[in-house]
Amino acid sequence: MSTIEERVKKIVVEQLGVKEEEVTNSASFVDDLGADSLDTVELVMALEEEFECEIPDEEAEKITSVQQAIDYVKVHVKS
């Protein structure tokens, strides 16, 4: 079983079409990885599907980096 961090990074690579080595914990989806608003919505939807959770819109807006996505999942998803 992959760790939450590995699973989040895999989703980011798949959704944004970036190289795995570009996906660092501090990487911003928009500034560093070139995501647009549609990409970020699709990214949140992929996270919801992977971790079988619902991320409210007001929370999704706060998830702007890889680390924030990892932290959100760790806090809100029962492993």
From Swiss-Prot:
<keyword id="KW-0963">Cytoplasm</keyword>
<dbReference type="GO" id="GO:0000036">
    <property type="term" value="F:acyl carrier activity"/>
</dbReference>
<dbReference type="InterPro" id="IPR009081">
    <property type="entry name" value="PP-bd_ACP"/>
</dbReference>
<comment type="similarity">
    <text>Belongs to the acyl carrier protein (ACP) family.</text>
</comment>
<comment type="function">
    <text>Carrier of the growing fatty acid chain in fatty acid biosynthesis.</text>
</comment>
<dbReference type="GO" id="GO:0009245">
    <property type="term" value="P:lipid A biosynthetic process"/>
</dbReference>
<dbReference type="InterPro" id="IPR006162">
    <property type="entry name" value="Ppantetheine_attach_site"/>
</dbReference>
<dbReference type="GO" id="GO:0016020">
    <property type="term" value="C:membrane"/>
</dbReference>
<protein>
    <recommendedName>
        <fullName>Acyl carrier protein</fullName>
    </recommendedName>
</protein>
<keyword id="KW-0596">Phosphopantetheine</keyword>
<dbReference type="GO" id="GO:0005829">
    <property type="term" value="C:cytosol"/>
</dbReference>
<feature type="modified residue" description="O-(pantetheine 4'-phosphoryl)serine">
    <location>
        <position position="37"/>
    </location>
</feature>
<keyword id="KW-0444">Lipid biosynthesis</keyword>
<feature type="domain" description="Carrier">
    <location>
        <begin position="2"/>
        <end position="77"/>
    </location>
</feature>
<keyword id="KW-0443">Lipid metabolism</keyword>
<dbReference type="InterPro" id="IPR036736">
    <property type="entry name" value="ACP-like_sf"/>
</dbReference>
<dbReference type="InterPro" id="IPR003231">
    <property type="entry name" value="ACP"/>
</dbReference>
<keyword id="KW-0275">Fatty acid biosynthesis</keyword>
<comment type="pathway">
    <text>Lipid metabolism; fatty acid biosynthesis.</text>
</comment>
<dbReference type="Pfam" id="PF00550">
    <property type="entry name" value="PP-binding"/>
</dbReference>
<keyword id="KW-0276">Fatty acid metabolism</keyword>
<dbReference type="GO" id="GO:0000035">
    <property type="term" value="F:acyl binding"/>
</dbReference>
<keyword id="KW-0597">Phosphoprotein</keyword>
